[in-house]
């Protein structure tokens, strides 16, 4: 049967390529920011939840040459695209795909790090494309269930990183704290200095610490800010 869904545009980075296939989710600035910001240099094992095309897993594999990475997704089209992207990357031997629901999957290990670009639309009109709907709406994975599952999957000193729109991110942090998490780091992302915070990069830990709060402005003076370039230059071709 012919696939009637449109293909997602491919995207090339400095050390790997993302072929979107029919995954329904193109490469986003959100994902790139999270993959560049999360501090996973001490992690030996990492789980990418809802990997989609595999962007976060690939960025983490590039950044940490010793980390073994599992990437899980429930969507067949996403898994097909991620498999192609993992196989064509320089780090295929350290990348494994898991098919299934993260809430019920029988994981055989705990993880030093978890990264996730979670669904965030809790209500309103659903995305027209079913793959995009699953990726963007909390239809199949509530934030509470996600946080509880991540808490159980982390190793004793593990950390988890997420990216969410500002309003949803504040609620996510509050919910996390009621479930026993502690905020370890937060980056407030602004498109420009004159625009409000649009995204939150969130670092959570099972142990209390002084949270590092920082800001990132993406564009300044009709170009990218020095901070944005410094954060993403290892990945973007034209940085």
Where are these regions (language model features)?
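Conserved SAM/SAH cofactor-binding pocket of Class I
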Residues: 36-108, 113-116, 122-127
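Conserved beta-strand segments of alpha/beta enzyme cores
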Residues: 17, 68, 94-96, 182-185
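Mobile active-site "lid"/loop adjacent to the S-adenosyl-L-methionine
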Residues: 118-145, 149
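Residue-level signal for inorganic ion chemistry
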Residues: 34, 117, 146, 204
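Conserved Class I SAM-dependent methyltransferase catalytic core
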Residues: 18-19, 23, 27, 141-197, ...
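SAM/dcSAM-binding transferase cores
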Residues: 195-239
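SAM-dependent Rossmann-like transferase core, predominantly class I methyltransferases
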Residues: 3-45, 51-53, 58-62, 200-203, ...
């Amino acid at each position: 049967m012919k696939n009637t869904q449109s293909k997602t545009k491919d995207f090339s980075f400095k050390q790997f390529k993302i072929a979107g296939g029919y995954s329904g989710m193109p490469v986003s600035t959100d994902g790139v920011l999270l993959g560049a910001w999360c501090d996973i240099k001490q992690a030996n094992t990492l789980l990418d939840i809802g990997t989609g095309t595999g962007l976060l897993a690939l960025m983490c594999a590039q950044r940490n040459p010793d980390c073994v990475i599992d990437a899980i997704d429930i969507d067949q089209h996403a898994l097909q695209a991620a498999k192609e992207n993992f196989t064509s990357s320089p780090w295929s031997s350290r990348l494994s795909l898991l098919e299934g629901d993260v809430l019920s999957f029988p994981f055989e290990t705990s993880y030093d790090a978890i990264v996730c670009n979670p669904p965030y639309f809790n209500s309103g009109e659903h995305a027209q494309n079913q793959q995009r709907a699953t990726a963007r709406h909390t239809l199949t994975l509530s934030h509470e269930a996600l946080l509880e599952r991540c808490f159980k999957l982390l190793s004793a000193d593990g950390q988890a990183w997420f990216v969410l729109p500002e309003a949803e991110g504040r609620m996510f942090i509050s919910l996390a704290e009621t479930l026993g998490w502690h905020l370890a780091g937060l980056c407030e992302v602004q498109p420009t200095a004159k625009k409000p915070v649009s995204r939150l990069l969130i670092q959570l830990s099972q142990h209390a610490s002084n949270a590092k709060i920082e800001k990132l402005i993406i564009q300044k003076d009709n170009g990218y800010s020095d901070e944005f370039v410094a954060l993403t230059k290892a990945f973007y071709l034209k940085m």
